[in-house]
Amino acid sequence: MVSLRLITGVLVTTASAFLVTLLMNYAIAIDYLKDSDPILGQLIDRIGACQLHQHELEGDLFFCLSRSILHQQLSTKVAKVIHERFLQLYPDTQFPLAQDVLDTPDEVLRRVGISRPKISYIKDLARHAISGLPTLEELEVMDDEAIIKTLTRVKGIGRWTVQMLLIFRLKRWDVLPVDDLGVRAGIRKLYSLDALPDRKTTEGFGQKWKPYCSIASWYLWRSLELKPV
């Protein structure tokens, strides 16, 4: 069996060709980011290899967007607990179906910790999914802004929610969620700013990271988990 050896010295078979290609693309992106922004480069060296692919989502469009709705304005820990309780309401399927969610009484959803506004958003999303949201395959051929324009027509789906879909499900590598608190906090910490950067300032940093803003965002999120040195 043919094998390939990466820079790291790890031996990989052709069965892992996709992973090899991904890691090589990561290497290209990392080299670019380190050259264009040495301060970010120091953070990259400290954190190590990009693991963005390990956080990618599964499931159809309804599942991914409903998950993002549940995560809105909550800490990752709290959102994860609520999402797991939500999934437990539908033990017969890996990914809840839109019709099943629509048929679930609001009070049942409230008991697993979902707020009433989010119940309204998820059920509106379910109605759109049943009546004809684009499939993930149809979204694949659309550009980022067209996808954002299409999906933000659904109540409760804002730009940030769609950007999470772009990064973690559609694998778009040049998305900068300028309204994301984690990204902004990461910028403030990394560049020793006095306050959280506003949208314009965040976009200014992003100009140095294009076309790999998603990769830069991942490192900024991870930076918040680091202990002070």
What are these regions (language model features)?
Residues 65-69, 73:
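Short, aromatic/basic-rich helix-turn unit that serves as a nucleic-acid recognition element
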Residues 73-81, 130-134, 170-175, 223-229:
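Short helix-capping/linker segments at secondary-structure and domain boundaries
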Residues 18-54, 120, 144-145, 159-229:
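C-terminal accessory module of base-excision DNA glycosylases/AP lyases that mediates lesion recognition
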Residues 2, 10-20:
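Acidic, Ala/Val/Gly-enriched low-complexity intrinsically disordered segments
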Residues 58-63:
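Short, flexible turn/loop "capping" segments at secondary-structure junctions
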Residues 39-46, 74-153, 208-210:
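Alpha-helical ds-nucleic-acid-binding substructure associated with the helix-hairpin-helix region
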